[in-house]
């Protein structure tokens, strides 16, 4: 994890907000050795850990049962990349490892945004949750109080079928998380749902989205349209929190304009007795 609470002051700090390594070391190294840094979730003592594989993060003591202590490096690097990307759009309105006091939420929410009256929760999956009820209860807890929840998967969960880039073999959690978005219904196919993944390819972080995925809960495969973009180039909808590819912004604007014209055309038909005359 990247966020800690100061035992002495209650201050919450995130390593990713420090861009100079020496400043980060001065802030956390000695304090961790003195037992002054606490986990945001379990309030156990943590220390700063430096790794060549992922950004500096905090490490629990051995044999900790805290769920934050058992996250994979894949999960941590995805969390770090997503947080950094969200900060470009929402700046100080983004919170990493947000702690929700709800028994159905086993760990911190990876990224939390409160922006202009809207609240977005980003929850990363790095492994399958087998229990159907557990998945449903988690979603209900994350979407309370009109929170818009976005599920994101690490790329190692993505299983494609053969050479067909648009065909995936989803886990139970991926089937559960498939969501119908405006970028599915505004597509030419006008059906299906979306799944999104973040991963590292050729030393760059990428966003992979599957749009218009067709397949019910009993299907072994889903088929749809695959899109891939460097995460740094991905757009963010400021009112919904959706992660979108650059070409989707223009495409959806065109389709919305077209649909608005069609609605106006339907409304203005003179032989419809319920239509207002403009």
Predicted regions and their residues:
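Non-catalytic C-terminal interaction segments of nucleic acid-processing enzymes
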Residues: 2, 13, 161-278
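A short acidic, often aromatic-flanked loop/helix-cap motif at beta-alpha or helix-coil junctions
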Residues: 12, 101-104, 158
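Mg2+/Mn2+-dependent nuclease catalytic core
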Residues: 126-153
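Short beta-alpha junction loops
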Residues: 153-159
């Amino acid at each position: 994890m990247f966020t800690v609470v100061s035992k002495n002051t209650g201050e919450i700090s995130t390593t990713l907000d420090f861009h100079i390594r020496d400043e980060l070391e001065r802030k956390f190294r000695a304090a961790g050795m003195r037992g002054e840094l606490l986990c945001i979730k379990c309030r156990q003592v943590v220390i700063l850990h430096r790794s060549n594989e992922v950004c500096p993060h905090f490490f629990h003591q051995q044999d900790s049962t805290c769920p934050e202590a058992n996250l994979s490096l894949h999960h941590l690097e995805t969390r770090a990349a997503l947080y950094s990307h969200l900060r470009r759009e929402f700046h100080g309105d983004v919170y990493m490892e947000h702690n929700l006091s709800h028994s159905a939420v086993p760990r911190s929410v990876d990224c939390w945004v409160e922006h202009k009256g809207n609240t977005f929760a980003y929850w990363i999956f790095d492994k399958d949750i087998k229990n159907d009820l557990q998945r449903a209860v988690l979603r209900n807890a994350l979407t309370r109080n009109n929170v818009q929840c976005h599920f994101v998967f690490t790329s190692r969960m993505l299983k494609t079928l053969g050479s067909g880039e648009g065909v995936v073999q989803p886990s139970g959690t991926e089937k559960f998380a498939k969501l119908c978005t405006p970028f599915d219904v505004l597509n030419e196919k006008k059906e299906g749902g979306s799944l999104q993944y973040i991963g590292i390819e050729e030393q760059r972080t990428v966003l992979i989205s599957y749009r218009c995925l067709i397949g019910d809960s009993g299907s072994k495969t889903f088929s749809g349209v695959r899109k891939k973009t460097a995460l740094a180039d991905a757009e963010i909808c400021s009112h919904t929190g959706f992660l979108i590819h650059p070409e989707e912004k223009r495409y959806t604007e065109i389709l919305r304009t077209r649909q608005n014209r069609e609605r106006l055309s339907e409304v203005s038909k003179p032989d419809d007795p319920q239509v207002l005359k403009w």
